[in-house]
Amino acid sequence: MNVSWALLAVVLVLTVATYECRPRGRILGGQDSKAEVRPYMASIQQNGIHQCGGVLIADKWVLSAAHCATNSSNSSLNVMLGAISLSKPEKYKIVVKVLREIPHPLYNSTIKHHDLLLLELSEKVTLSPAVNPLPFQNENIDISAGKRCLVAGWGQMRLTGKKPDTLQELWVPLISRDVCNRRNYYDNEITANMICAGESRKDSCEGDSGGPLVCDGIAVAIVQGGFRKCGNPTKPGIYTLIEPYKSWIMESMYNATLQSNPSPL
């Protein structure tokens, strides 16, 4: 009898361990993307290593998250576009140096407010079936809770730190701000400029930060960073809405263009 109970205890321990080791990455529960399906996706890299996601919004501009910035006057970042695989050769894959990093001036790394970053590329990219900008939300439209939107990235897939070589994508439901601000969720930390999305064991994670949340073919928000256990139903993914920052985006792009191409006296 004692042996039987010992065996049962071992089985229970192994079962719990197996459950805890299931993937919990941000793009947890996702699937491989396909070539040319997400031509707006960008991999922001430092020394050839993927750091964050991003979204191509113009032929010389990528939108990402402010916590992905290097905080250096001379950017050491590169952006990979036209890729599904981070390592394998692909027909339209290109790597472009970042000329300028423009984090939102009010970004607060402690509370993650205004977590947006504009990256000006060193050259205009040649558009192709695998490299194409995505329009972003510029109208103040409240998207209904429960709507399923797409998030993609090369972020962490397991708590062990495993990251994919192939772009992962996942449809996640939006969660109302009222629910996300409940005490057992984020306890009133979600501002009017943020939105939550995700469900149990379906989420985005470390390395997906900066990538877009896409609803009806439009980038509506950007994946935030944060210290949380990915895939936790009461700690869903937090995203920075793009629409409240449309003026900052357009003005920053315009001013940077003027600096790069000053008018003759």
UniProtKB/Swiss-Prot annotation:
PROSITE patterns: TRYPSIN_DOM, TRYPSIN_HIS, TRYPSIN_SER. Pfam families: Trypsin. It comes from the Eukaryota. Residues 1-21 form the signal peptide. Keywords: Disulfide bond, Glycoprotein, Hydrolase, Protease, Secreted, Serine protease, Signal, Zymogen. GO terms for cellular component: extracellular space. Glycans are attached at residues 2, 71, 74, 108, 255. Residues 27-254 form the Peptidase S1 domain. Residues 22-26 form a propeptide. It is found in: Secreted. GO terms for biological process: proteolysis. GO terms for molecular function: serine-type endopeptidase activity. Probable serine protease. Belongs to the peptidase S1 family. This is Serine protease ami. The lineage of its organism: Eukaryota, Metazoa, Chordata, Craniata, Vertebrata. The gene is ami.
